[in-house]
């Protein structure tokens, strides 16, 4: 890449199947300079969360969901991170799991908001993925920091489960924090399909939609290169250049 350009790399769930594929993802990121990393949930995680939601969100087994997320991610974490970094990841993961396990009171207070609850609970797949990638990159001595898209200000309209990105507002909210992070030598690791509505409630862009940053790149609003990395075996780049 030319000087001053930033590469955006989006890793899909098929790249995040097990410890081996995850290690290859880390190697790819480690070999880049001036990049933003956008993560999906680990393979099968979102589908499993949806299966837990079933037909009745109000009766979801929150402890069972928490146990699944803990087991799925700790199996991988234990193979790639160690010592104090692993301990910090475990603590941060526990805080997310506590939020899930205590969500029953909110379900009881707002029984009719099925899509709202579904979006909130589904978002943890990507949030934990970002947390684990960030921890693993730090284990390798890299200055990585995790960002949740709804905290950055990825604004959506429409439904909770298939929101539409508000392009202008979102681009204004997120450009400076992310660009400044890269200029300061940081690797921002960001969720891909999570946003928030004008009330600050968690929304999703939909499983078949484009992730939020690609909407911005499509509009040629930022000077970046976008690489979507799909293949589990070869990790072939499929670039779309956005001048």
Language-model regions, residue ranges each:
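Nucleotide/pyrophosphate-binding catalytic subdomain
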Residues: 1-243
């Amino acid at each position: 890449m030319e000087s001053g350009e930033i590469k955006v790399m989006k890793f899909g769930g098929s790249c995040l199947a097990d410890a081996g594929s995850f290690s290859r993802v880390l190697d790819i990121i480690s070999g880049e300079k001036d990049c933003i990393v956008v993560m999906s949930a680990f393979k099968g995680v979102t589908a499993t969360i949806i299966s837990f939601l079933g037909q009745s969100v109000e009766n979801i087994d929150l402890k069972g969901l928490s146990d699944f997320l803990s087991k799925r991610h700790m199996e991988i974490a234990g193979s790639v991170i160690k010592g104090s970094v692993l301990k910090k990841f475990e603590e941060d993961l526990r805080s997310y799991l506590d939020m899930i396990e205590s969500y029953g009171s909110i379900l009881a207070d707002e029984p009719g908001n099925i899509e709202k609850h579904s979006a909130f609970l589904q978002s943890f797949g990507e949030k934990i993925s970002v947390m684990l990638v960030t921890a693993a990159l730090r284990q390798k001595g890299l200055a990585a920091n995790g960002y949740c898209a709804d905290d950055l200000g990825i604004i959506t309209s429409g439904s909770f489960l298939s929101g539409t990105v508000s392009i202008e507002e979102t681009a204004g909210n997120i450009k400076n924090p992310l660009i400044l992070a890269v200029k300061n030598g940081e690797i921002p690791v960001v969720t891909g399909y999570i946003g928030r509505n004008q009330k600050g409630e968690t929304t999703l862009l939909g499983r078949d939609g484009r992730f939020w940053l690609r909407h911005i790149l499509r509009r040629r609003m930022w000077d970046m290169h976008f690489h979507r990395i799909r293949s589990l075996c070869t990790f072939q780049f499929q670039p779309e250049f956005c001048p």
